[in-house]
Regions:
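Glycine-enriched alpha-helix->loop->beta-strand junction motifs that scaffold or abut catalytic
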Residues: 30, 54-56, 80-85, 143-148, ...
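Short acidic, glycine/proline-enriched helix-loop-strand junctions
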Residues: 44-61, 107, 111-116, 231-235
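Charged helix-capping and loop-helix junction motifs
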Residues: 17-21, 71-73, 99-105, 131-138, ...
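N-terminal pre-domain/capping segments
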Residues: 1-80, 84
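C-terminal helical cap(s) of enzyme catalytic domains, especially alpha/beta-barrels
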Residues: 224-241
Length: 241
């Protein structure tokens, strides 16, 4: 599955018409599926655009408040698009992860009852140790009833051995975000796959070995036009798969 998280090209998806044109370009580049992102309105019109151009929707990514407050509409969008996974990410949680997980588990039960999987997408703040000495990711791995949706860049940014994390948690991973990290004179930034310093090839090989088939290209910040970045990344991915 050659997938992309359309947050990557968000400047090209501000309206339905723009999204339609951008998703057509993604399909022409060789992508055959997408993961949607945004508020409920954006999820709705990008789902419509994806269906119009013939791109499979593997899932959506939003936040806990949005999915809690728009449950019925979200499930409608999921069924319309054929998507199967609902993902959330969170702002910094720290030791407050316990309360967040309680709410997430309540929604997970509802999502599962409606035929959908529910996943947590990490950034790097989950790897900061709180006053208890534990990291938010420890609470999430131990207590979250849903799946994990790891992000390779943010795992690396959090000081984690990316391949080991994927290996240790493989049973809970259905979707993996592929994102490269580039070193600059000012620190680190996002880059197209294969243009950074991460072992993306090794990560892909490990994912294949573990049966993780939903590999999703994502780039939070692009130095040039994001559609060009999407092209560079899929060309790399085609060669690596």
């Amino acid at each position: 599955m050659l997938s992309i998280q359309i947050y990557t090209i968000r400047e090209h998806t501000k309206t339905y018409e723009d999204a339609l044109n951008a998703l057509k370009k993604l399909k022409d580049l060789g992508y055959n599926s997408v993961q949607l992102a945004g508020n409920i309105e954006k999820l709705e019109y990008t789902a419509k655009a994806a269906k119009e151009v013939g791109l499979e929707v593997i899932g959506v990514l939003s936040n806990l408040v949005t999915v809690e407050e728009n449950q019925d509409k979200l499930f409608e969008i999921m069924r319309y698009s054929g998507a199967t996974d609902i993902g959330i990410s969170a702002d910094e949680v720290g030791d407050d992860a316990v309360e967040m997980i309680k709410r997430a588990n309540a929604f997970c039960k509802i999502a599962n009852a409606n035929g959908f999987t529910f996943s947590y997408h990490n950034h790097s703040h989950e790897f900061i140790r709180g006053e208890s000495g534990k990291r938010a990711i420890d609470y999430i791995i131990e207590s979250f009833d849903g799946d994990l949706m790891p992000d390779t860049y943010w795992l690396q940014h959090g000081g984690v051995d990316v391949i080991k994390f994927i290996e240790d948690n493989a049973k809970k991973i259905k979707i993996l975000h592929l994102k490269d990290m580039q070193r600059t004179v000012d620190g680190v930034t996002f880059s197209e796959l294969g243009k950074g310093n991460m072992n993306i090839k090794g990560i892909i090989e490990k994912a294949k070995e573990l049966g993780i088939s939903n590999l999703v290209v994502e780039q939070d910040v692009c130095q040039g036009d994001s559609l060009k970045s999407a092209e560079i990344s899929i060309d790399y991915l085609k060669g690596a798969l």
